[in-house]
């Protein structure tokens, strides 16, 4: 993937292969390619999954993401309907991709 004149290494599905390549600007480009216009709600989830990864060294699958979001932000944001509205192709799949993280293990 080329971004700002630099080749960024990704796997076959477009996930970054090097976490240190991530930036908010690159996240915006990945989101654009995913057909998502990032809002403050998207950024909250993106920063949440990055913090989750740094703490647990794993990208959260949907069930884990919903549970952790509910604990952190309450049931309004910690439910799959809310997350799927933000990331229609799958909150774990798209949020982790935009956040520059590896694809969750239990993600199809």
UniProtKB/Swiss-Prot annotation:
Provide the GO biological process annotations. tRNA wobble position uridine thiolation
SUPFAM superfamilies recorded for this chain?
A: DsrC, the gamma subunit of dissimilatory sulfite reductase
Q: What's one GO MF term for it?
A: transferase activity
Q: Does the keyword Signal apply?
A: no
Give the residues annotated as active site.
107 (cysteine persulfide intermediate)
Q: What keywords were assigned to this record?
A: Cytoplasm, Transferase, tRNA processing
Show the GO cellular component annotation of the record.
Answer: cytoplasm
* Record-listed E.C. numbers: 2.8.1.-
| Location(s), subcellular | Cytoplasm
Keyword hit for Transferase: yes
**What family does the database annotate?**
Belongs to the DsrC/TusE family.
Function, in words:
Part of a sulfur-relay system required for 2-thiolation of 5-methylaminomethyl-2-thiouridine (mnm(5)s(2)U) at tRNA wobble positions. Could accept sulfur from TusD.
Q: How does it assemble?
A: Interacts with the TusBCD complex. Interacts with MnmA.
The cross-references to PANTHER family, in alphabetical order and at most eight, read: SULFURTRANSFERASE TUSE
Under what name is this protein listed?
Sulfurtransferase TusE
Q: What is the lineage of its organism?
A: Bacteria, Pseudomonadati, Pseudomonadota, Gammaproteobacteria, Enterobacterales
* Gene name, Swiss-Prot/TrEMBL: tusE
